[in-house]
């Protein structure tokens, strides 16, 4: 399970250090793809297989299902950690996530997946989430 929030920098070659706590589960390789809210998602091969099966079950007759499949699969790349525990982020995914070369990134664990965010975007998303969480607690007790 992937937990926590970590600050890193995307290096000049488009690589991001993956926290050491996450590396063991990624030793057999992983898939990097587009995530919600302009983040990138890293999935283990097992999680990717499960997601692929769910995507295959979506009706091809629904436009939103086709668009979702296109977004997830066309942006996906097989990847592997290098000897320094870094993962290469291709240019198309850097553009999607608004993460510039030498830019600040936030790597978060979200249970079964890892998300990579532009730190600027992450702060905005996190502020919104914290506000919503506070409101949910007020309503639910």
Would you name each region that the model predicts?
Residues 1-8, 12, 22-79, 83, ...:
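Flexible "stalk/tail and boundary" regions
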